[in-house]
UniProtKB/Swiss-Prot annotation:
Source organism phylogeny: Bacteria, Bacillati, Bacillota, Bacilli, Bacillales
The keyword Heme belongs to this UniProt entry's keyword annotation: no
Cellular component annotations (GO), alphabetically ordered: cytoplasm
NCBIfam families per UniProt: plsX
Gene: plsX
Protein's recorded name: Phosphate acyltransferase
Position of the signal peptide: none
Annotated keywords: Cytoplasm, Lipid biosynthesis, Lipid metabolism, Phospholipid biosynthesis, Phospholipid metabolism, Transferase
Keyword Metal-binding: no
GO MF term set: phosphate:acyl-[acyl carrier protein] acyltransferase activity
Top EC class, one word: transferase
Disulfide bonds: none
Gene Ontology biological process terms from the UniProt entry: fatty acid biosynthetic process; phospholipid biosynthetic process
Superkingdom of origin organism: Bacteria
Amino acid sequence: MVKLAIDMMGGDNAPDIVLEAVQKAVEDFKNLEIMLFGDEKKYNLNHERIEFRHCSEKIEMEDEPVRAIKRKKDSSMVKMAEAVKSGEADGCVSAGNTGALMSVGLFIVGRIKGVARPALVVTLPTIDGKGFVFLDVGANADAKPEHLLQYAQLGDIYAQKIRGIDNPKISLLNIGTEPAKGNSLTKKSFELLNQDHSLNFVGNIEAKTLMDGDTDVVVTDGYTGNMVLKNLEGTAKSIGKMLKDTIMSSTKNKLAGAILKKDLAEFAKKMDYSEYGGSVLLGLEGTVVKAHGSSNAKAFYSAIRQAKIAGEQNIVQTMKETVGESNE
């Protein structure tokens, strides 16, 4: 049985989409128990595997992260993290304030001994539909080569345990594919990755080929990773808008759009990384999953499923035994 703590109040569309996703999750997964934290006035579920705990406070999207977790000790997000810290829950899921969630992850759930910097990881779409693991996308703006090596080790475990990929191919994001390309960070990181024979490091990868499906894990610093992620999000939205405008521009195009409706929907689904779940803060003593702030019920359900798989695969213990112990 996997037990997850969930923030009912976090996100733009909470609590409605959270409640809908939780209800579907406990119906679909018979080995799942939920601890739900939020306002009792807005709780309306009744299921034997859902335990509700009232919280009198909520961390808002605009709250300053560290100050919020210190001042709002009875908030749904803080109480959720405390449940993971105490061992009551195997992991947690929230669509709330990203900075606050990273703060409760670091200061309440806690970092695995030997992990220098936790990393925020997402799974992004590829042309062939299989996707790739991408980290760090914003946990740490600055990074050292040793941190990128550790990100690769964490990403390797994540790709194996969560995505079911044997011997995943690992690449370093750079401005060229040649080993000598890049700045001091990427050059030294390349050396370290190449020397770690426990990893299937296949070299550098350029941003323009990220979605080609040639690799399984891509490693970069949080500053670069966050910009790449937001660029991909923006590009996908722009392409969608351009397609819509083109289809609506004439009767002929509208007819073509009606014929291609199913194919266009499939394309949109393939480009939507929320299909793969939320982003995960790797390197902590428990699984911490961040669903997108504007998640609908389907996306939040995917984040719950992702956290459940992490619990089933005992990913935290694997990270302790490999990355943690090797760096103590």
